């Protein structure tokens, strides 16, 4: 029997997660199998710890989860082993950096990150993994949108060049507003509201991978660097995840209605995305 595929799961958490995300995240993880520990059930362990040493419970539980907590799940013909890392409430790029370090340290095959303000389908991992196999992607994200008007998709095409004054490369990101729908869309970068990525890129790139003084988001910057070592970046627009706003969850349906009712000229301002040929999902 072949070795399980090892996946590290992390939730970059700034400490202000809306409660709407809690139940959704629980359902996401329940799809990945039954929680297992080496000696006793986690629930029993937590109860005993809170009873005997409440002042130390949180720190000990965090260490216990990181060392022993894992899910094992068979998807199709492949066996997956899921590990959860508790990073804590820190700056999101720093949280991604720590997750990547753990993925490299423990020889994970994939890193799977879900931001703490996203509402996702229960079977999102299965969908992204299947799409990754179909497309040959090294980084794949579901369709998502910014939380504020005009609610842009976090899908980007880049223009690269050489800065003769500073003697350095530069790149400019352009949002792909009219993206191909129900396709696997190859792109230059995508937002990491949720992302599944292979870990070989961390070995090829020099750390820090996400922390930077650049004036662009850490997710876009990582995609730019990863493509330089041969990675392919895709967005799966066959489904979308909700971005928790106030008070609205920003989904594709909400954005389409916003364009029709408020931003009626948006289709005239943005061209169709043609830089890469989008892949049709099998079965279409």
List PLM regions with ranges:
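C-terminal catalytic/acceptor-binding lobe
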Residues: 199, 204-284
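Active-site nucleotide-sugar/metal-binding loop of Leloir-type enzymes
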Residues: 97-110
């Amino acid at each position: 029997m072949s070795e399980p595929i090892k996946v590290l799961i992390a939730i970059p958490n700034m400490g202000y997660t809306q409660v709407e995300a809690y139940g959704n995240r629980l359902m996401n993880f329940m799809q990945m199998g039954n929680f297992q520990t080496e000696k006793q059930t986690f629930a029993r362990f937590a109860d005993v710890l809170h009873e005997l040493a409440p002042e130390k419970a949180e720190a000990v539980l965090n260490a216990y989860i990181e060392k022993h907590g894992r899910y094992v799940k068979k998807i199709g013909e492949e066996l997956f082993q899921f590990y959860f890392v508790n990073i804590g409430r820190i700056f999101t790029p720093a949280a991604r950096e720590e997750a990547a370090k753990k993925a490299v340290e423990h020889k994970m095959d994939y890193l799977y990150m879900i931001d703490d303000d996203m509402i996702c389908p229960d079977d999102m991992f299965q969908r992204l993994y299947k799409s990754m196999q179909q497309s040959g992607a090294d980084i794949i994200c579901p369709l998502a949108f910014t939380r504020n008007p005009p609610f842009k998709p976090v899908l980007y095409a880049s223009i690269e060049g050489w800065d003769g004054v500073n003697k350095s490369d530069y790149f400019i990101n352009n949002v792909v507003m009219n993206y191909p729908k129900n396709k696997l869309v190859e792109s230059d970068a995508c937002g990491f509201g949720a992302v599944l990525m292979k870990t070989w890129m961390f070995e090829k790139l020099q750390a820090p991978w996400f922390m930077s003084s650049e004036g662009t988001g850490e997710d876009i910057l990582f995609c730019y660097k990863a493509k330089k070592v041969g990675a392919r970046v895709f967005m799966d627009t066959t489904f979308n995840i909700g971005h928790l706003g106030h008070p609205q969850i920003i989904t594709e349906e909400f954005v389409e209605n916003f364009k029709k009712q408020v931003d009626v000229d948006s289709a005239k301002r943005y061209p169709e995305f043609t830089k890469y040929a989008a892949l049709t999902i099998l079965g279409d």
